Amino acid sequence: MLEADLVSKMLRAVLQSHKNGIVLPRLQGEYRSLTGDWIPFKQLGYPTLEAYLRSVPAVVRIEASRSGEIVCYAVACTETARIAQLVARQRTSKRKIGRQINCQMRVKKAMPFFLEGKPKATLRQPGFASDYSISRKPNSALLRDRGSALGVKADVDMPPYPDTPVQRHASMSANSRFSPKSSLPASFQTHISRACPTEVNDNLNQTVEKPNITPPASYTNKMDEVQNRIKEILDKHNNGIWISKLPHFYKEFYKEDLNQGVLQQFEHWPHICTVEKPCGGGQDSLLYPARREQPLKSDQDPEKELPPPPPAPKQEVPSQGSPAVMPDVKEKVAELLGKYSSGLWASALPKAFEDMYKVKFPEDALKNLASLSDVCTINYISGNTQKAILYAKLPLPTDKILKDEGQAQGDFDIKSMIEQEYLQIEKNMAESADEFLEDITVPPLVIPTEASPSVLVVELSNTNDVVIRYVGKDYSAAQELMEDEMKEFYSKNPRVTPIQTVHVGQLLAVNAEEDAWLRAQIISTDENKIKVCYVDYGFCENIEKSKAYRLNPRFCSLSFQATKCKLAGLEVLNDDPDLVKAVESLTCGKIFAVEILDKSDVPLVVLYDTSGEDDININATCLKAICDRSLQVHLQVDAMYTNVKVTNICSDGTLYCQVPCKGLNKLNDLLHKTEDYFHCKHMTSEYFISLPFCGKICLFHCKGKWLRVEITNVHSSRALDVQFLDSGNSTSVKVSELREIPPRFLQEMLAIPPQAIKCCLADLPQSIGMWTPDAVLWLRDSVLNCSDCSIKVTKMDETKGVAYVYLFTPNNFPDPHRSINRQITNADLWKHQKDVFLSAVSTAASSPGNRNGGTPAPGSPAESLRKSHPEVIKKSVLDHTSSFSLEELPPPVHLSRSGEHMDVYVPVACHPGHFVIQPWQEIHKLEVLMEEMILYYSVSEERHIAVERDQVYAAKVENKWYRVLLKGILTNGLVSVYELDYGKHELVNIRKVQPLVDVFRKLPFQAVTAQLAGVKCSQWSEEASMVFRNHVEKKALVALVQTVVEHTNPWDRKVVLYLVDTSLPDTDTWIHDFMSQYLLELSKVN
């Protein structure tokens, strides 16, 4: 029974550390990562784990997720209510504050085949880097509220200090089993923790002593360096520092992260620091320099060094009635302490005394520490008479030995006088620092280097003057730490008083609302009030002079966080009231991902709202919001429209039409004027697109005239995707083919809404996927680019922006039985092309009594067609012979011979036994090939071909075209392909597979399967694979070829090689050495 209770407690602890629950298959692994054991459900009498979990409803709550997975949640009890509250208050990026914010853009990289970094041409002296450091990405930050001052709260997760093992003396939970990864070096733990995060168990009261594990000798110097650094930090903060703030100062001073485990060791480092627990009982503690009672010792001249004053009276707690300590014992204690220059804990004195003198230390002397005060200095911790540190007294000249109490009192008076002088000196230094504060230069704000940083939009006066704040560890998080320190400094420092004289431009510390302390700069002054700008928030406010204080220099090291930017694409309309209002309503007070186009003093940016399922381009959205509504087509239900032009027909049957209206007439007039303008005026470089970005509207010359297009995706500096605003077509073009709209027509051109209207044929089933090629071709031949068609609107879907219409050709208008809708339903092509089902009776879909709408009834011909759809595809693939002959394959890519080096890039890595490399020298040719394939296949006619396994094709994967090997054909219309240049396996629609033309068969396939040499392992664990991937995937490395295994098919070639990371400044890291060391450490743990 005790075992069952123990398992229940541990299970609740595991579940409580996961706010969002744990899926059932992962529960055993999470339990074992914390306890070292599996859940013994069979020993407890249950056949399955789920049966055991359902037997303890007071511990586990089981629910089914939307995807059908079983998820386990913790059930709080009285004992663990406090823990549940703490977990609920965790500040993570998933917590909703106002709305959920995803600060990571889902927008794909403009050029996924673009590589960052370059391997070095030659290797330095090979060697294994034991202090391999790994950078970790900071967590996303959160929006917080500071009254009128907008703020950002970040959850900063400090990574472990590299290669710093921590020797713990503190107690641990009885059920906290030894974790395999706890004994690995920090460089390994960093990678493992990404897949197996360490969980914290707060639910156990029983404790046992953890064995004292001595760190390896190679780490001793590292620990000494950490201790010396902490001592330097404390020397700069004589008044103490909160332990929770120490990692921030450590990172700021030494540009390294402090291992969180070090924070638990301070009580055992009396020679480094003194720890005091505040009386309030909070979780945080204060940290002081060691031997704080002698603040002036290091500041005095060694030749004039004063003797140490006696301990303060409050530290001497004599024990009445205790026997006196023998003089010989005191002499031995003084001699013993002389060997401990950093002090000795009183509890350790008996053991050290006995080890040195082979004599037992008197027990009464330990109970009466005050009796030893004449031979040592006693520093009581938190007033506890049983917890103290003993320091040896410095030897004094015999003529100055203190013999009586009066002399001691006089010496105490000297100490008090020195302390007063020290405080006065500190005050004078603070005042002098204030006098020279105006000469201090605050460092400029550095634009983040990451691809899509997050920003908080504060306010704007126009679109060229938008005030933002960057969100992140080095920005909003650092600012919040600084503000907490400001609050502590100004609230608890009695010497700080409001400023008396002020002048414009002066920096201040302002006591704002909710007792917040913010940095500000004076804009203007009045008799009793001053107008300040909060330099970290970007807004202004009139405040009383009594709330303004001098800004201490220590708070000037962080850059002003409020900065300005310009919204790309809105420059010409930057002060338009409607535009400013639209931008303000969509952006102010919200966090966005930002694409920085130009990193100038005022950056040019594009904002993306990533809080929903799709990323929304805010710049483009605001531009469309201010279009002239009077120039937009307003279709009415049951209305008839003539002279309609069908401009585009999609493969799913969707139509785009142009309906005559005022906006279309004005657009055509403007485009004619633009044509004349370009014809008469010499085309200069100012009209070429120098900075393409998504959402930009420009001109493209097509079929002898200029058309409006919007950039939808930037592949590279040469190729991009555009959508024709007024026809609905999409294509890929070269950047050099686009032109800027002339300034004289720009404002009018932007005011005209898109003239392409999205339509669907009424009474035909919707959302059925692709139509057959024959059906789409028939529809295109019938109505595409016909300028005198007619439509009748039957329904408007405002949410989707779709009009449901009957479509008529000129000869059939207005007979509904001869509409395109009826013709396509009754056409003979559906009898032999059964990829799509259509309702033969139009009234059934629109009848009020038909609840299924356009869905065919079971047993109907349409339902039969739907069921036969996969078989039809499979049969057509097998029966039809390809009309395109297979060209010869390109030669295999060149690889270095055995024993030679080559520069490589690793696009994909599974484990050391299987990964993919690309020769670095050939990558620029692959980039050019990718661009050319995008441009070619985006404008070429889609061909319906019969595909075969193990043949080479071109396939479209996520808007880009790749050279692929077809590996398999599925029955649901999908095919499995292998990217021959990148080594990835993908599933694509069979319609996205096209013949690979001869011009794209000349470059050798770039992906080569590889195996890491120098390591022997038959089966790689998930953790080992993760470590390997983190070291090599998407990195440029140097390879030393051992063996090349040739094959007739270039995609079956294999190379066995060594990999070397040369990115570190002082050493080369051989990956096989690193993995061998990892396996060795793991085997020791197991």
UniProtKB/Swiss-Prot annotation:
Keywords: Cataract, Cytoplasm, Developmental protein, Differentiation, Phosphoprotein, Repeat, RNA-binding, Spermatogenesis. Coiled coil: none annotated. It is found in: Cytoplasm. Residues 295-306 have a biased composition (Basic and acidic residues). Disruption phenotype: Mice develop cataracts and glaucoma and males are sterile. Within 4 weeks of birth, mice develop a posterior cataract that becomes severe with age. At later stages, the lens fiber cell compartment develops vacuoles with lens capsule rupture and extrusion of fiber cell mass into the vitreous. In addition, the mass of fiber cells passes through the pupil into the anterior chamber of the eye. By 4 months of age, iris flattening is detected and anterior chamber depth increased. Residues 3-76, 222-291, 325-394 form the HTH OST-type domain. This is Tudor domain-containing protein 7. It comes from the Eukaryota. Residues 881-1086 are annotated as: Interaction with CABLES1. CDD domains: LOTUS_1_TDRD7, LOTUS_2_TDRD7, LOTUS_3_TDRD7, Tudor_TDRD7_rpt2, Tudor_TDRD7_rpt3. The lineage of its organism: Eukaryota, Metazoa, Chordata, Craniata, Vertebrata. The keyword Cytoplasm applies. Mainly expressed in testis. Expressed in spermatogonia, spermatocytes and round spermatids (at protein level). Also expressed in the developing lens. GO terms for biological process: germ cell development; lens fiber cell differentiation; lens morphogenesis in camera-type eye; post-transcriptional regulation of gene expression; spermatogenesis. Residues 849-1086 are annotated as: Interaction with CDK17. It comes from Mus musculus (Mouse). The gene is Tdrd7. Gene3D superfamilies: 2.30.30.140, 2.40.50.90, LOTUS domain-like (3.30.420.610). Belongs to the TDRD7 family.
